[in-house]
């Protein structure tokens, strides 16, 4: 799962929907 934080930084997360801001 690839998500983006509030600053548009690409954050790679395995098996989790948690976003590190």
From Swiss-Prot:
Its main location: membrane. It is a multi-pass membrane protein. It is found in: Cell outer membrane. Keywords: Cell outer membrane, Disulfide bond, Ion transport, Membrane, Porin, Transmembrane, Transmembrane beta strand, Transport. One of its GO terms (molecular function) is porin activity. GO terms for cellular component: cell outer membrane; pore complex. GO terms for biological process: monoatomic ion transport. Disulfide bond interactions within and between MOMP molecules and other components form high molecular-weight oligomers. Structural rigidity of the outer membrane of elementary bodies and porin forming, permitting diffusion of solutes through the intracellular reticulate body membrane. This is 40 kDa major outer membrane protein. The lineage of its organism: Bacteria, Pseudomonadati, Pseudomonadota, Gammaproteobacteria, Pasteurellales.
């Amino acid at each position: 799962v690839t998500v983006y934080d509030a600053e548009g930084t690409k954050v790679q997360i395995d098996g989790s929907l948690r976003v590190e801001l």
